[in-house]
Each structure stands twice: as C-alpha cells, then as structure tokens.
C-alpha cells in the first residue's frame, strides 16, 4: 500500500509539472503565420502542386452569353450578311450608310436578290468590316446608248422587280449596245471603294437578247491596276428561279487616281463609291443576343470580362481581351505557403510556432504572435510584416494583365477552296502561336508563384530574426518557432516585444538567475509526454491491482460472496 501511495504521489507530481510559460517566472512567445483549413494548389518552378492560403484564377473560362453594346458600337446584321448590306439587297436597305465598331453576322442571314458570287469574298468582307461604315456617295456616271436600272423578279423591291440598290444593271437600248468608256477621277483626299460586276447569262439567246453581242467584255482600270472580265455563258444550278449569275468585283481608287470603265456588254455598273476609313472595326459571326451592358471584350460566345490575363472561351475576339490559351485554369498565388494548424497538440494543447504549422483564425494579418504567460494566453497580428508582403503581392495580377492584355482583335480567317494550302499553313501558324502563348503563360505564372512563396517565407524569417535580436540571452529558441522567456513577462512586456520597444537589459539579471533555478534537468516535450503517459498507465495498473486485492480480501472475510456455476 505504501508503494502505491508513493507511485501515485510521483504521478501527481509529474502531472502537476509546470509547462513553459505557465510558471509566473517564465513565458512562451511563438511566431506564426496565417493558415486556412483547405488551401489552394498552385504550380511553381520547383513543385507541380504546392498549397497556398489564397490564389487567384487567371483564366477566364466562361462568357456572359450575350454581346454588350457598350463601349463598342455593335451593329446587328439580323438576317443580312455584310456583303448583302454593301450591295444593297432590298431586305437590307435598313443598313444603308450605317457605321459600327463590330458588325455581327448571324447564322440565319440570307440573300434575297439576284444570285451572285464574289471571287475574292473574304478580302472584300474584311476590307469593308475594318472600314466600319457603309457610307455611300452617289456619282453622276454617264451611260450613253444603253438602258439603265435593269431588274429581276428574283430581287423584289416592293411589288415589282428590282435590283441591288448600289449597282446599275445596263442592257441594250433598242437593238444596240455601244462600247462604253467612262472615267471618274478621285479628287478627294480619301480612298474610294467602287463595287461593280459582270453578268453571266445562262444561254446564248439570253446573252444576245440583253446585250446584242455574242460575248461581252468588261475592263476596269486605274493607274495602279487593271481587271478584264469576260462572261461565262452557261446554265448553273437554279437559285430563286434563275440559272444565270452575277460576279461581283471591287476596285479601290486612291486620291489623285482615275477610275476607267470600258465595256461592250454584260456590265453591272457602280452608282457611286463607298468612303473608306481606317480604324479598328471588325466583323464577327455569332448568334449571341445583343444586350445593354458594358464589356471591353467580345467573343462569338458573348462578352467576357477582361480582368484576367488569359481566356480559353474562344480564339476569335474583339476589343481589349485576354490572350487565348489552351489551359482551363492557371492559378496565381496571392497568399503564403499553407500549413494547416494541427488540432491536437500533445496532452496539454501547447502552442507552437511557424516551423511546425500555421495558425488558423488570424483574420487581421498574415504574420503574428501567440503567447502564454502568468496572465494567460493571447494572439496579435504583426501589421508591418503583413503589409510588406501584401504590397509586393498586390501588384502581381495587374502586372501580368499588363504584359498580356492588349487591345487587338483576332479576326476570322476565310479562304476559298483553291487556297487550301494557304489555309492549312495559316492554321498551323495560329496553332503554333497558341501553343507558344500557352507555354509562356504557364511559365510566367509558375515564376510568379515561386517568387510569392519565397517572398512570404522571407518575411516570416525576417520577423523571427527581429524578435531573436531583441530577446538575446533573455530567451531560448525552442526549435519550433517559439521562444522560452526566462523572466516574468506580462502582457505589457509581450506588447513591447511585438512593437520593437523591448529593453532586454531591464530583464537580463532576472533571466540569468531563472536559467539556473529552473529544474536541474529539463525534459524535452516529446520525452516528457512519453513519461507522463507511461506514469499514467502504471498508475492505472496499480489501481486495478489494489481493487482486485480488495475484492479478494472481502471475499475471505465473507463480506462478498462469489458463486461460480459450471
């Protein structure tokens, strides 16, 4: 029994052993950083996946689903293509003299006039789209000896037959079609775009009935260029009741140049010119609805925000848009390395510093202090080191956007069948550019993330070194980001350490004296926990032995009866 009492006494002494910081003559001060229960994984130069407290997504992967009409002027083509609006298809008259920043062509657009083709359709479409206007000036061409304003039932304008409003179909007058030779100088200081064409009858009979001659010819020239077109007579697939066709051509006349038109038949003559402008206007095929909203960047899928440096919504864009990349996600670290706080810390829940883990719940700063002293425990953020890290990180996103977000537009590429090899080459070049930008984007983000993590680690180390230089021999590093302070350090003392006004000379003598008076042999926390657990187990075993001995003694005295039945 004496042995049991002695062991129990030893166990109680062990359990009652003071923790560092719980003694009135000492205190514990730990330095730590912010942590969250579930961080975000980012990529760095050295690690494919490293957890940080916070990160910002850099890839815009979705659109609004609608095209914003501000700040860009959007012109909805509705059921008209840009070329139909240019030629003056009757159902596109509403677009006469219109202007735009972006002309939106719809998939439902259709032609409703004389069937035609444009041999260099893509170039004409791109030229007019970039000009951003359908401003048309009528000129007084003199066509002597022919009938003007030809029309067709395939191109209804009101109840009667009609034709493209910007073109003049010339046919024979009586039984003659004289040779036409007309000149028109450009005395203005801007480029003029003339649209003209040639008619391809379906039969020889149609040819002679319209133009007398068995074969016509059209020559349009300037000082810089000349085009001679001969009609191809023959039947073609029927479109809107016609098997004949019109081919549309175009000529640009520079200031000081002269337009010369010579023809003996089949001429579809211009009525005037389109005033050409230089600008950033463009065209886009999209079925996204147009809405009243504000967005700098437009894609065929709809408008997208341009507050991110990259996007993978669509390769085709207009406005100040993020660069297109292949990646669905690229995360930029905007916080420090995340080390979630351990929920169980030994038998007594002792505090620990940044070397072991981070601290959750630090909402007022990234770096801070925790302490245990005679007045209890406490925590406070270090705003100076926090602000130093934030100042350097805040500009990262803006810098990445500045490097990648330029005001440009990526137009659609169109090529005819005969230009298939050019189309393949262009696609290869475009894909290579995207691959290069995707690689550059990933590398740029990885470099920035590496710098952020190194920076935040450095700020933590700076704060620790600053504290160590203040405490000097008055405290001892505990190896986990904490200091054991060998003098009484109340809350005012702790605050002086945090704000840098701590005077170690004031406490020097007390600290040195306490170093020698505190336990002769100080057990490390890991071994101490083991010994405490072993002592606890031995005590429980001895208590069980005592209880069993008491039961046996009671049975012998007859105070307890035990019946065993078999």
UniProtKB/Swiss-Prot annotation:
Question: Its GO biological process terms?
Answer: clathrin-dependent endocytosis of virus by host cell; fusion of virus membrane with host endosome membrane; fusion of virus membrane with host plasma membrane; viral budding from plasma membrane; virion attachment to host cell
Q: Give GO cellular component annotations, separated by semicolons.
A: host cell plasma membrane; membrane; viral envelope; virion membrane
Q: Where is this site: Cleavage?
A: 345-346
Q: What is the lineage of its organism?
A: Viruses, Riboviria, Orthornavirae, Negarnaviricota, Polyploviricotina
The record's annotation in Pfam families points to: Hemagglutinin (PF00509)
Cite the InterPro entries for this sequence: Capsid_hemagglutn, Hemagglutn_HA1_a/b_dom_sf, Hemagglutn_influenz_A, Hemagglutn_influenz_A/B
Covalent lipidation (S-palmitoyl cysteine) residues?
555, 562, 565
Q: What is its biological role?
A: Binds to sialic acid-containing receptors on the cell surface, bringing about the attachment of the virus particle to the cell. This attachment induces virion internalization of about two third of the virus particles through clathrin-dependent endocytosis and about one third through a clathrin- and caveolin-independent pathway. Plays a major role in the determination of host range restriction and virulence. Class I viral fusion protein. Binds to sialic acid-containing receptors on the cell surface, bringing about the attachment of the virus particle to the cell. This attachment induces virion internalization either through clathrin-dependent endocytosis or through clathrin- and caveolin-independent pathway. Plays a major role in the determination of host range restriction and virulence. Class I viral fusion protein. Responsible for penetration of the virus into the cell cytoplasm by mediating the fusion of the membrane of the endocytosed virus particle with the endosomal membrane.
Recite the other comments. Answer: Major glycoprotein, comprises over 80% of the envelope proteins present in virus particle.
Extent of the signal sequence: 1-16
Is DNA-binding one of the keywords? no
The transmembrane segments are 531-551
Post-translational modifications reported in the UniProt record: Palmitoylated. In natural infection, inactive HA is matured into HA1 and HA2 outside the cell by one or more trypsin-like, arginine-specific endoprotease secreted by the bronchial epithelial cells. One identified protease that may be involved in this process is secreted in lungs by club cells.
On subunit structure and binding partners, the annotation says:
Homotrimer of disulfide-linked HA1-HA2.
- Give the Gene Ontology MF terms in alphabetical order: host cell surface receptor binding
Record's keyword terms, sorted: Clathrin- and caveolin-independent endocytosis of virus by host, Clathrin-mediated endocytosis of virus by host, Disulfide bond, Fusion of virus membrane with host endosomal membrane, Fusion of virus membrane with host membrane, Glycoprotein, Hemagglutinin, Host cell membrane, Host membrane, Host-virus interaction, Lipoprotein, Membrane, Palmitate, Signal, Transmembrane, Transmembrane helix, Viral attachment to host cell, Viral envelope protein, Viral penetration into host cytoplasm, Virion, Virus endocytosis by host, Virus entry into host cell
Cytoplasmic side of membrane: 552-566
Glycosylated residues are 24, 38, 54, 97, 181, 301, 499
Extracellular-facing ranges: 17-530
Task: List the protein's name.
Answer: Hemagglutinin
* Stated family: Belongs to the influenza viruses hemagglutinin family.
Location of the protein in the cell: Virion membrane; Host apical cell membrane
The gene that this protein is the product of is: HA
